[in-house]
Amino acid sequence: MSSVIQVNLPQTSYNIIISPNSLGSVGRHLTSLNLEQKILVISNPEIFDYYGEIVINSLKQAGFKVFSHVIPAGETYKTLDSISKIYDTALKHRLERASTLLALGGGVIGDMTGFAAATWLRGINFIQVPTSLLAMVDASIGGKTGVNHPQGKNLIGAFYQPRLVLIDPIVLKTLPVREFRAGMAEVIKYGVIWNQGLFNQLERQKKLDSLDSINLETIQTIITQSCQAKVDVVSQDEKEAGLRAILNYGHTIGHALESLTGYREINHGEAVALGMVAAGKIAVKLGMWKEEMSQRQKNIIQKAALPVIVDYPLKSQAILESLQLDKKVKAGKVRFILPTDIGQVEIREGVPSEVITRVLEEIKM
């Protein structure tokens, strides 16, 4: 059972292929793109140990000349220094403009590989083979690439679209439970901002905390619906001039929490979950959303065993100050994405700081 979603943008188009056991046929899929021979696979040690051989063998069988570059796992390595090391490997193997960088891994690997592809020789081919749920439903789609700065997440980056996104849901079997739950945060986000049917489906599930609690057919449906939601938005607003900003639901406070904890204590999905809880509460206080809706969202987040309380010694003032460094700040005003109904949100500027502070105090231990 396979699904294909076409992404049509003003200057390019590509497919998202969602197909179980497709990792072993990555070479065949790339052959149809008429790529030049050289491919540099970028991964982290654990993912490369699991899937590097099957991907490289498939590429070689399809006639590609394959090299690899492994980056230590984690947000702390999502830096310009890591990008420079990718450039070194690209230079060593004489990658040219017609060559390809292939991201085999989660969101961190995808973001860095895409940024390296966008900037090496002013742009070479880029392929996404996401191995985490978060990367499958979010990070691999839409062309956002980049690295972190010590003072903020993804402050250095570029929009650069892949030639193909190949998703094999089977690889989720080796994904750590905590990372699976992190991906569910982005899935829940799509239900709140765009797809009421997806939200209702998540509500019907008894648990969302591991692959053991969701059968393969259901997880593939959830992945497909999530990808389609993101494609619907990105197709209308590729470079975040307006509508695409709604994809940042939960990310405003979420990014601040990640930054203030040094990208170590809390992962991206956990931060987004907390950000969604906060955004829901802000919307209620502003009279935009009903308390009942906020509680329904919170219940789904808890089904995924994601946090709804900030269990870290952070001061509300520090979080407020970090919000000012968010890349979505416009004319000095923090922009929040706030829900008005299930499947609908608004972009709101100028939320009173006292409202934000009150909500931050409510979600802290």
Swiss-Prot record:
Cofactor binding description: Binds 1 divalent metal cation per subunit. Can use either Co(2+) or Zn(2+).
What pathway is this protein said to act in by its record? Answer: Metabolic intermediate biosynthesis; chorismate biosynthesis; chorismate from D-erythrose 4-phosphate and phosphoenolpyruvate: step 2/7
* Binding site residues for NAD(+): 107-111, 131-132, 144, 153
Query: Could you cite one Gene Ontology molecular function of this protein?
Result: metal ion binding
Does the record carry Hydrolase as a key word?
Answer: no
Top EC category: lyase
Which InterPro entries does the UniProt record give? Dehydroquinate_synthase, DHQ_synth_AroB, DHQ_synth_fam, DHQS/DOIS_N, DHQS_C
Could you say which EC number(s) this protein's record lists?
4.2.3.4
Task: Establish whether keyword Nucleotide-binding is in the entry.
Answer: yes
Name the catalysed reactions.
Answer: 7-phospho-2-dehydro-3-deoxy-D-arabino-heptonate = 3-dehydroquinate + phosphate
Matching entries from PANTHER family are given as: 3-DEHYDROQUINATE SYNTHASE, 3-DEHYDROQUINATE SYNTHASE, CHLOROPLASTIC
Q: Which family does it belong to?
A: Belongs to the sugar phosphate cyclases superfamily. Dehydroquinate synthase family.
Q: Which named protein is this?
A: 3-dehydroquinate synthase
